[in-house]
């Protein structure tokens, strides 16, 4: 059995060596073994000191209290409890403890200083508290007095919002019956007062779980949702923000440290489930405004699916699928033109599609996905009714909405009996609403070639008739987009054109005509861009489009409007125009094999060849495409999806292809715009944007391309391109870019090292590809100026220096030899230790050095002579080795040459080396 006294001594030793965790373990073990009260008090006091050091103030105060219970005059325990209580904000209790300490030891300066400090702090706190109390009362008096001046009420309302955001102010409002008074403001029916009350409640709920829980129960979820349901965008948004803050506080997502009182809060899962249920009920309630429905969808989108798929708990999504998927589908199926439609905004159905997509992506296994599909199938088939056309429209509109979300699921639903047939049948209807719904559904359904072929066979003539005959612009533009999408169903395959030669050109002209017509509403012009997004897969169309500068500028202007849902269509059009989509590599042998087996072989359009693409890129740059792209990158994250970011990254990379164009891109802010694309989005998008940054950073002045602190943000994307899974060209251009950056300053070199680029750069110095090996060595040459890199070369047990010396001997690759010799010159000039190490790591060092000094390339020769000087300057023994070899003769020949401008720096370096030898007394001047 262990001895408690020995355990105490061990604990003391651990405490003195700052190993507080080990000390706590020893004291805790000793406490279990001992019954003597005085000894227990000492152990509690010691453990309290450990907890103080670990910033665990609650436990420190508890242990000190246990020691004081045994001996009320234990001065150490009293002071430790005082320190802990002060940190916990309990100043009055801390003051009492230090007052007792000062009574016991009146001359102790530490106690007296603490007593004075705490006294001052308590006075300040009381002053703030009383002033806050009076301010809160005064504000509520003004707000609740209907006779108060409007200006006074607005000022009081704003002050209340500010107070609600401060912890002390929020607590004072809460303690002074503030929640009930705020509810009176909400009941006043004055929009300004309602907004102020909601925003104040929102501030009070932020970062405080106990207060948030109390407010939920005092106000009620039902009441908050009814406020969010009103037809006022600002109030709906404020109520949404209030609910979001409540959810964040209940789940701990606010990332704030919670105090001791948080332990009293009961399990919050029940409250969160009630909130989710109320939000789902809001989706199908006719009493809820379009803005309220949008905010309910936004809250579900943000809080239900998992952010991190590594977290295996998707129970929230499963609950919503079971309890509310049909309600979400009801929103998807709404037709705004019908009289009994729920109140909607232009974005409501799109938000619902996003939610369906996120829920479907959040499912973890096939049974969960099957359940999701079955619910959708039952809902759609249950909506079909031969006697009720409105129900049929609702079913088709639902399928259309799902096709805009989880497309794979939507495609399975298209296979249901009667769905495609119903779409085609509704297209032939004389009712404009039927046509509108059916045409839009056909557009979304014709993404897969097999579906497009069915529509071309059964419905294209109907679409043409609608396009020619209808006078309704909304239907006409949708019919046009439908024809555009069907016409592009063959993709870039020239042999799979769906329509006759010239048909797609006519469709494109009409799209451009609508796009350039400012009298048309944004929604119609948006559809025109969507049509072009499909048609520009045809090389003839994209060639004509980029020549039409008016259409390009109209599209760019449209992308800057408040309706950001157009961004994906614009980005896709630009991807098509620059040919920056993925193209499978054509292997000639496989083509021959396919022809032999009578399989279809894709054909490239003549205008998709490299020279045509380059001309299109030049025209886009001339039309100010970079400014438009920069504006698109700044769009709100909820609209700028990862897929859109990927498309923008592809376009930027294609625009950066020609080094001559990179100056224009930098001048128009393209370098800055690419940074966020390289840091966020899909893996493919980040790689493409990083590659674009590498192309810019490789040839541009970093101060101009990435001004200020932005240059440091570029390093991580560039380092990511050094991954061995990336292409050789990406590795090469990333190394060039890092070389350029590392030559700028040591802070940048330090950032490159911090991002763990050194091992990757060293790895590429062994690469078989000579250009990559050269780029890596050049990068190392610049990094060699950094202290940490020098230390890595000086460290024992590695061959870094040996590799550099051997690369200096690569006479067949002059650029590589220059880079390696430059690195060696830097290292030997900076550290004398490396001069000695150079002669030890390989026996070939002398031969390689002599070859450097005799090189025909002046840059290599200069580096060789500098290395020789560094060795001579470093140590007399090293100098002796060089003098005893043929090096002396080589340096003498170089030093005796007549002054020549292009070789003067080499001659001077050789002369300096000879002067040093003269100083050592190894050689004498000829009298």
Curated annotation (Swiss-Prot):
Organism: Xenopus tropicalis
SMART domains referenced in this protein's UniProt entry, alphabetically: ARM, TPR
Domain of life: Eukaryota
Tagged with keyword Transferase: no
InterPro entries: ARM-like, ARM-type_fold, Armadillo, TPR-like_helical_dom_sf, TPR_rpt, UCS_central_dom
A Pfam family hit: UNC45-central
Secretion signal span: none
GO biological process: cell differentiation; lens development in camera-type eye; muscle organ development
Annotated Gene Ontology cellular component terms: A band; cytosol; perinuclear region of cytoplasm; Z disc
Tissue: Detected initially throughout the somites and the heart and gradually also expressed in the jaw, branchial arches and body wall muscles at later embryonic stages.
Listed SUPFAM superfamilies: ARM repeat, TPR-like
Protein name: Protein unc-45 homolog B
Keyword Repeat: yes
TPR repeat placement: 4-37, 41-74, 76-108
Known function: Acts as a co-chaperone for HSP90 and is required for proper folding of the myosin motor domain. Plays a role in sarcomere formation during muscle cell development. Is necessary for normal early lens development.
Entry keyword set: Chaperone, Cytoplasm, Developmental protein, Differentiation, Myogenesis, Repeat, TPR repeat
Alphabetical list of Gene3D superfamilies matching this protein: Leucine-rich Repeat Variant, Tetratricopeptide repeat domain
Entry's localization field: Cytoplasm, Myofibril, Sarcomere, Z line; Cytoplasm, Myofibril, Sarcomere, A band; Cytoplasm, Perinuclear region; Cytoplasm, Cytosol
ARM repeat extents: 167-206, 209-248, 746-785
């Amino acid at each position: 059995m262990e001895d408690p006294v020995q355990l105490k001594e061990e604990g003391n030793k651990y405490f003195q060596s700052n190993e507080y965790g080990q000390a706590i373990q020893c004291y805790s073990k000793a406490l279990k073994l001992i019954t003597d009260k005085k000894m227990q008090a000492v152990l509690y006091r010691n453990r309290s000191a450990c907890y103080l050091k670990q910033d665990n103030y609650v436990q420190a105060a508890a242990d000190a209290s246990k020691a004081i219970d045994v001996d009320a005059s234990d001065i150490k325990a009293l002071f430790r409890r005082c320190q802990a209580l002060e940190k916990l904000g309990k100043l009055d209790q801390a003051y009492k403890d230090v007052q007792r300490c000062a009574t016991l030891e009146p001359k102790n300066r530490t106690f007296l200083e603490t007593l004075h400090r705490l006294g001052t702090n308590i006075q300040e706190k009381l002053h703030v508290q009383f002033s806050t109390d009076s301010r809160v009362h005064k504000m509520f008096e003004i707000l609740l007095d209907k006779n108060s001046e409007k200006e006074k009420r607005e000022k009081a309302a704003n002050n209340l919002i500010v107070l609600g955001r401060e912890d002390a102010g929020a607590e004072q409002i809460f303690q002074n019956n503030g929640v009930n008074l705020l509810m009176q403001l909400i009941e006043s029916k004055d929009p300004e007062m309602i907004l102020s009350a909601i925003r104040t409640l929102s501030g009070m709920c932020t970062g405080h779980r106990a207060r948030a829980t109390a407010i939920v129960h005092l106000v009620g979820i039902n009441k908050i949702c009814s406020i969010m349901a009103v037809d006022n965008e600002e109030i709906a948004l404020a109520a949404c923000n209030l609910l979001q803050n409540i959810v964040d506080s209940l789940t701990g997502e606010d990332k704030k440290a919670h105090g001791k009182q948080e332990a009293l809060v009961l399990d919050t899962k029940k409250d969160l489930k009630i909130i989710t249920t109320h939000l789902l009920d809001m989706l199908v309630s006719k009493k809820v405004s379009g803005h309220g429905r949008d905010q309910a969808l936004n809250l579900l989108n943000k809080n239900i699916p998992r952010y991190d798929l590594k977290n295996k708990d998707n129970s929230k999504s499963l609950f919503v699928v079971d309890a509310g998927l049909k309600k979400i589908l009801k929103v998807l199926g709404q037709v705004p033109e019908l009289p009994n439609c729920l109140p909607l905004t232009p974005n409501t159905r799109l938000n619902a599609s996003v939610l369906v997509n996120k829920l479907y992506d959040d499912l973890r296994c096939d049974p969960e996905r099957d359940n999701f599909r079955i619910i959708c199938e039952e809902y759609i088939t249950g909506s079909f009714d031969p006697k009720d056309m409105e129900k049929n429209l609702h079913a088709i509109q639902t399928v259309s909405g799902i096709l805009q979300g989880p497309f794979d699921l939507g495609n399975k639903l298209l296979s249901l009996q009667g769905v495609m047939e119903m779409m085609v049948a509704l297209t032939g209807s004389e009712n404009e609403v039927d046509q509108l719904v059916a045409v839009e559904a056909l557009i979304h359904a014709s993404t897969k070639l097999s579906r497009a072929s069915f529509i071309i066979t059964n419905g294209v003539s109907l679409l043409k008739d609608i396009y020619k005959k209808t006078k309704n612009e909304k239907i006409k533009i949708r019919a046009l987009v439908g024809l555009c999408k069907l016409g592009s169903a063959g993709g870039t395959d020239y042999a799979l054109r769906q329509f006759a030669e010239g048909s797609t050109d006519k469709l494109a002209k009409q799209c451009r005509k609508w796009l350039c017509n400012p009298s048309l509403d944004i929604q119609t012009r948006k559809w025109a861009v969507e049509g072009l997004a499909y048609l520009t897969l045809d090389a003839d169309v994209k060639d004509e489009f980029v020549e039409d500068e008016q259409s390009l500028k109209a599209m760019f202007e449209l992308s800057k409007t408040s309706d950001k849902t157009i961004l994906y269509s614009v980005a896709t059009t630009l991807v098509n125009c620059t040919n920056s989509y993925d193209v499978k590599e054509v292997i000639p042998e496989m083509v021959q094999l396919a022809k032999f087996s009578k399989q279809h072989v894709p054909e490239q359009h003549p205008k998709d060849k490299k020279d045509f693409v380059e001309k299109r890129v030049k025209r886009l740059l001339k039309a100010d495409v970079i400014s438009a792209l920069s504006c698109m990158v700044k769009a709100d994250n909820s609209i700028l999806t990862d897929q859109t970011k990927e498309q923008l990254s592809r376009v930027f990379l294609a625009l950066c292809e020609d080094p001559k164009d990179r100056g224009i891109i930098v001048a128009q802010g393209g370098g800055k715009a690419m940074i966020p694309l390289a840091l966020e989005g899909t893996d493919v998008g980040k790689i493409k944007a990083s590659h674009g940054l590498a192309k810019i950073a490789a040839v541009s002045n970093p101060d101009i391309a990435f001004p200020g602190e932005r240059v440091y943000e570029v390093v991580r994307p560039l380092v990511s391109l050094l991954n061995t899974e990336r292409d050789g060209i990406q590795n090469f251009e990333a190394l060039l870019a890092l070389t350029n950056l590392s030559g700028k300053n040591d802070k940048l070199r330090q950032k490159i090292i911090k991002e763990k680029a050194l091992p990757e750069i060293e790895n590429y110095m062994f690469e078989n590809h000579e250009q990559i090996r050269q780029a890596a060595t050049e990068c190392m040459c610049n990094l060699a100026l950094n202290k940490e890199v020098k230390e890595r070369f000086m460290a024992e047990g590695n061959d870094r220096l040996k590799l550099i010396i051997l690369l200096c001997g690569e006479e067949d690759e002059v650029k590589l030899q220059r880079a390696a010799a430059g690195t060696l010159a830097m290292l030997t000039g900076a550290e004398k230790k490396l001069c000695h190490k150079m002669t030890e790591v390989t026996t070939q060092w002398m031969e390689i050095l002599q070859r450097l000094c005799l090189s025909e390339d002046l840059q290599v020769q200069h580096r060789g002579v500098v290395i020789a000087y560094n060795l001579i300057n470093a140590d007399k023994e090293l100098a002796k080795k060089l003098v005893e070899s043929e090096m002396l003769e080589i340096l003498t020949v170089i030093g005796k040459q007549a002054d020549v401008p292009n070789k003067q720096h080499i001659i001077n370096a050789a002369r300096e080396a000879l002067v040093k030898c003269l100083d050592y007394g190894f050689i004498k001047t000829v009298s």
